[in-house]
A protein has these predicted regions:
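Conserved N-lobe beta3->alphaC-helix segment of eukaryotic protein kinase catalytic domains
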Residues: 39, 44-70
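A short, aromatic-enriched beta-strand patch in the conserved N-lobe beta-sheet
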Residues: 79-80
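Activation segment signature within eukaryotic-like protein kinase domains
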Residues: 117-118
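Conserved short submotifs of the Hanks-type protein kinase catalytic core
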Residues: 85-98, 102
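Protein kinase glycine-rich loop
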Residues: 17-28
Length: 398
């Protein structure tokens, strides 16, 4: 394995503690940064495999978006770098597992728990949309919990800057994909609100509003009728305001959807009356759901060996000898968005700056002044998890 990098950061800057995930491009490691013992998650991705699977734009797109955004309710990139063989993307380490894992485990959530999760998601989406970014793949697998139960948005592999003409952009996950995307229509950030409504519906009702065996079957069901939660269908312990919130998010017609005129429509919905967005941003609201570490990580899954055929190995070797291989990732280096050595656009707009208080979450300082010291989360037991392999929580673009 190569170990040559550009800049002051490389693979040898870290202690590799354990594998916490695997995917088509490589491994996800729990690592310790030697400079200050901070623990992070590191994606180690084969450059040749990325090229082989035509995923260069996905990987570079995710890196570029994470280079611009830094916020407490999304996964934050700390470093990105490369050597001769691999790309490395270092992010926060979240140990609570993804929302899908917990949905499978708990089967149902209370209204209070759901409102808290939606509040976290709304703040995360607000910062993305303020910076003109559509996530396009909001689903439980892409929402992870930290050890205190705060929800964070992850996986920006198919996220895009919003454009007026984007009808050809049809990536996403059936069941959470907005109808305008499925119908090859131009779309806005409102597609993320539709997905949020589907998740909220699922947390309330235990199933998605539109279910099918294929993308076409789901599309046909969406086109057939508008799903509405009726009063007599509201589960015990849930309010009519919660049902109204969901019903307005899952509107098939974008212009009728809650949030179409701006995210303040969502934040000001009656379900969030008396909800303090400032307290949530400053993490003064305690999560009503605290994840358990006991069974959300399958070490056996991560220990399985990768089997590469001779034919595939020959193809990978051919890719490595190509001119494209030498130049296509040339701007991958990143320290943090305020470091002059990073290839990033320093145009980040934080719509929640008005919420910031002394000692609250703040933007990172230059790397030379060191990353914050070892967090309480990093001091926890060895039961860490960024993804949940037991529930197929391995990113398709790793």
């Amino acid at each position: 394995m190569g170990n040559k990098t550009t800049g002051d950061i490389d693979r040898n800057s870290f202690d590799f503690l354990s594998i916490i995930g695997k995917g088509g491009f490589g491994k996800v490691w729990r690592v310790r940064y030697k400079q200050n013992c901070q623990e992070f998650a590191m994606k180690e991705m084969s450059k040749a495999k990325i090229i082989e699977k035509n995923s260069v734009s996905s990987i570079l797109g995710e890196r570029d978006i994470l280079a611009q955004i830094h916020h407490p309710f999304i996964i934050n990139m700390i470093f990105s770098f490369q050597d001769e063989d691999n790309l490395y993307l270092v992010t926060n380490l979240f140990t609570g597992g993804d929302l899908r894992y917990h949905m499978n485990k708990e089967q149902s959530f209370s209204e209070n728990e759901t409102k808290f999760f939606m509040g976290c998601l709304i703040l995360g989406l607000e910062v993305l949309h303020t910076n003109n970014i559509i996530h396009r793949d909001i689903k439980p697998e892409n929402l992870v919990l930290d050890y205190k139960g705060y929800l964070k948005i992850t996986d920006f592999g198919i996220a895009k800057k919003q454009e007026k003409q984007n009808s050809n952009e049809t990536s996403g996950t059936p069941g959470y994909m907005a109808p305008e995307v499925m119908n090859f229509q131009n779309h806005t950030v409102a597609v993320d609100y539709f997905a949020m409504g589907v998740i909220c519906y699922e947390l309330m009702m235990g199933v998605r509003p539109y279910v099918g065996e294929s993308r076409n079957e789901i599309k046909e069901k969406i086109l057939a009728r508008q799903i509405v939660i009726k009063s007599h269908e509201i589960p015990s312990g849930w309010s009519k305001d919660a049902a109204d919130f969901i019903n307005n998010l899952i509107q098939r017609k974008p212009s009728s959807r809650l949030g179409f005129k701006g995210i303040n429509q969502i934040k000001q919905h009656k379900w969030f009356n008396h909800f303090s967005w400032k307290d949530l941003y400053n993490m003064r609201i305690e999560s009503p759901y605290i994840p358990s570490y006991e069974d959300n990580f399958d070490s056996n899954y991560c220990e399985r060996e990768d089997n590469i055929s001779q034919q595939e190995q020959e193809l990978l070797n051919k890719i490595k000898s190509s001119e494209q291989y030498k130049t296509i990732f040339k701007n991958f280096l990143f320290f943090n968005m305020y470091d002059e050595r990073s290839n990033s656009q320093k145009t980040f707009i934080n719509p929640h700056k008005k919420y910031e208080e002394k000692q609250a979450y703040s933007s990172p300082q230059k790397l030379k002044s060191t990353i914050p010291q070892l967090s309480d989360e990093a001091k926890e037991t060895n039961k860490f998890n960024l993804f949940s392999p037991r529930n197929n929580k391995i990113k398709h673009h790793i």
